[in-house]
Amino acid sequence: MADPIFFKPSRELTIGDVADFTGASLRDPKLAPRSVERLASLKDAGEGALVFVEGKKNVSSLVGLKAAGVLCTESLADSVPSGIAVLVSRHPHRDFSAVGRMLFPASVRPESWLGETGISPAAFIHPTAQIEDGATVEAGAVIGSGVTIGAGTLIAATAVIGQNCQIGRNSYIAPGVSVQCAFIGNNVSLHPGVRIGQDGFGYVPGAAGLDKVPQLGRVIIQDNVEIGANTTVDRGSLDDTVIGEGTKIDNLVQIAHNVRIGRFCLVAAHCGISGSCVIGDQTMLGGRVGLADHLIIGSRVQVAAASGVMNDIPDGERWGGIPARPIKQWFRDIANIRSIGQSRKDASSDE
């Protein structure tokens, strides 16, 4: 439920507005003026709520439903109880999310943590920093020398932007974020605790132990990237670490030096991407995936959760397991292991 204490709707909304905004087909046009008071899950629905449902396996969830309206596919429309506005959509979840973003814009990009706009007198901003009109810098933020920040960008309380970094327009830098040796594009979101541009993990054997390898590269984060809380992105050693346009990275991910991630990738929580890996476009890594160093992972690849990848993966393939291998082979290996275990169990019971 969207608690109005935290998420105030940007406007009043009717069923007709939802149909117009999403392009969904309203079964009964007479219900267009009905008010939508809130967005809700099926289990939390009630009078005034807009919900969505997709997939025939969820048809039982519609029994006894009370709501102002339902976004659903054509195959489920006849199962919606009478009196509820039916909005037929090819993509109910996507349309429901679009309504949520329109109605509660602060839920996807906070406008301010402290309820203030403009440049706070309690922020430290170096005189050589250049901040465009329309940017917000909250109390306790630190902006180093030579930094540039674009219009519409929010630098939240206690964020630290190191010298000569560049941040584009309409980006969001949350509390506790540190940025150094980095160029960040437009519409980028860095959630609390993100670390960008610290030195990578590089050592060589020396005369008296381990000598540190200088990390002289940068981090380049392209437009429309989102990085979750407490994720770390190390700067390159000589080459740059690059996060491609539109890529979304979950919380608690480690991205090592010289990694290059392509466009529109998804990286789930607890992944570890070792140094100098190259990942193509539209690739998805499930939670807790680990990549060995210097791997080349193709475009449109899917790697199952908790997999350990030790080899390159060609474009378009699905891999899983430890060590990771093509998904069908992994399934066969699991089946064979189970079969061997069952055979041994049967043999021991016959003795």
Curated annotation (Swiss-Prot):
Keywords: Acyltransferase, Lipid A biosynthesis, Lipid biosynthesis, Lipid metabolism, Repeat, Transferase. This is UDP-3-O-acylglucosamine N-acyltransferase. Pathway: Bacterial outer membrane biogenesis; LPS lipid A biosynthesis. One of its GO terms (cellular component) is membrane. Catalyzes the N-acylation of UDP-3-O-acylglucosamine using 3-hydroxyacyl-ACP as the acyl donor. Is involved in the biosynthesis of lipid A, a phosphorylated glycolipid that anchors the lipopolysaccharide to the outer membrane of the cell. One of its GO terms (molecular function) is N-acyltransferase activity. It comes from Brucella canis (strain ATCC 23365 / NCTC 10854 / RM-666). The active site is at H257. Its EC number is 2.3.1.191. GO terms for biological process: lipid A biosynthetic process. Homotrimer. Belongs to the transferase hexapeptide repeat family. LpxD subfamily. It holds the Pfam family LpxD. It catalyses: a UDP-3-O-[(3R)-3-hydroxyacyl]-alpha-D-glucosamine + a (3R)-hydroxyacyl-[ACP] = a UDP-2-N,3-O-bis[(3R)-3-hydroxyacyl]-alpha-D-glucosamine + holo-[ACP] + H(+).
